[in-house]
Amino acid sequence: MYEKILVPVDGSATSLTGLQEAIALARVMGSTIRLLHVVDEISFMTSFESSMALTAEVFDTLKKAGQDVLQDAQNRVRAAGVPVEAELYESYAGRVSDLVIAKAKEWGAQLIVLGTHGRRGVGRMLLGSDAEQVLRQSPVPVLLVRGA
């Protein structure tokens, strides 16, 4: 039924709960999972009370952390015997939810699976409001998986 499942991940326990649900579905349906991690510089910058100049070194650290999140998620999917692709995307403006929807359309995803209430700040991927926006605007079905 769903050949392509898009799964945004941020490394939080809630995000991993969503990933586990996607893996279970993909195994039954023979689907491919596409992982998406957004390096969201705007959220990182606004998480500080005082203004601070972010250096290339800080952005490199954010990207490296994102690559680690994707690698861990890929390992989990591969261990379950499910085909997997991964994408790291840097966002300098706009909402993460808009990017998730755009990437779902671009890849031809037939389902989006995401955990709700992820982390804030550096590890932020999807919060309640972003998950709600994905749910409202997505052209494909969305499975929201609530964290334990």
Where in the sequence are the language-model features?
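Residue-level recognition of beta-strand->loop/alpha-helix junctions
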Residues: 37, 88-90, 146
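A short acidic, glycine-rich active-site loop
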Residues: 54-68
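Short, hinge-like loop/turn segments at secondary-structure boundaries
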Residues: 51-54, 103-105, 130-131
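Structural beta-alpha unit
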Residues: 75-112
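Glycine-rich, Arg-bearing micro-motifs that act as flexible, cationic patches
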Residues: 111-133
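Small/aliphatic-rich secondary-structure junction motif
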Residues: 3-53, 76-85
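Short, flexible loop segments at boundaries between secondary-structure elements
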Residues: 142-148
